[in-house]
Swiss-Prot record:
PANTHER family: CENTROSOMAL PROTEIN OF 19 KDA, CENTROSOMAL PROTEIN OF 19K CEP19. One of its GO terms (cellular component) is cytoplasm. Belongs to the CEP19 family. GO terms for biological process: cilium assembly; microtubule anchoring at centrosome; vesicle targeting, trans-Golgi to periciliary membrane compartment. It comes from Danio rerio. It is found in: Cytoplasm, Cytoskeleton, Microtubule organizing center, Centrosome, Centriole; Cytoplasm, Cytoskeleton, Spindle pole; Cytoplasm, Cytoskeleton, Cilium basal body. Residues 90-110 have a biased composition (Basic and acidic residues). The keyword Zinc does not apply. This is Centrosomal protein of 19 kDa.
């Protein structure tokens, strides 16, 4: 049975992971609700995600879903069990992703991240045919704008050379 995952998400009550997938043989879209059992606010999310991905019953549906995606979904579930709202949880994890060191990733993971960034760039890009496209956009920064100083802008560092 060939299955391609299209979307995945979480359901808070009862704690579940939801996979929307396409069955390639029949061409139909289906929804699978996978209950997350024995999961508490103190559970290890990476372990739970790995256990779920390799579960006999659910591995067929989760083979297209990355382990990192499953970990993020488990983090959302854990944050909900700890009392955080969905918005707070998403904001906290988005901030962690922004500070991630891309130099420490494997080549495969790095190329996947670059492809995601390129896709996001292409979606946000303004083209000539767009209604809000401006060819020569000029932006003036007012007098009240804050100027940030950098360590290399200091005059005393020039004396060292």
């Amino acid at each position: 049975m060939s299955i391609v995952a299209k979307r995945c998400g979480v359901k808070f009550t009862p704690p579940s992971i939801i996979i929307i997938y396409e069955n390639k043989t029949s061409g139909k879209m289906r929804k699978r609700v996978i209950p997350v059992r024995n999961f508490s606010q103190y559970s290890d999310c990476s372990r739970a995600a790995e256990r779920l991905k390799h579960h006999v019953r659910h591995s067929v549906y989760l083979e297209c879903v990355s382990l990192a995606q499953l970990e993020r979904l488990h983090l959302l579930l854990r944050d909900h069990l700890q009392g955080a709202s969905l918005e707070e949880s998403l904001a906290a994890h988005r901030h962690q992703e922004e500070e991630e060191d891309l130099n420490k990733l494997s080549d495969e993971e790095l190329s996947r991240r670059k492809a995601q960034m390129d896709d996001l760039f292409q979606r946000n890009r303004r083209r000539r045919g767009d209604p809000d496209f401006v060819y020569d956009l000029e932006v003036e920064f007012g007098e009240g704008s804050v100027k940030e100083t950098c360590s290399w802008d200091e005059e005393q560092s020039d004396q060292e050379f």
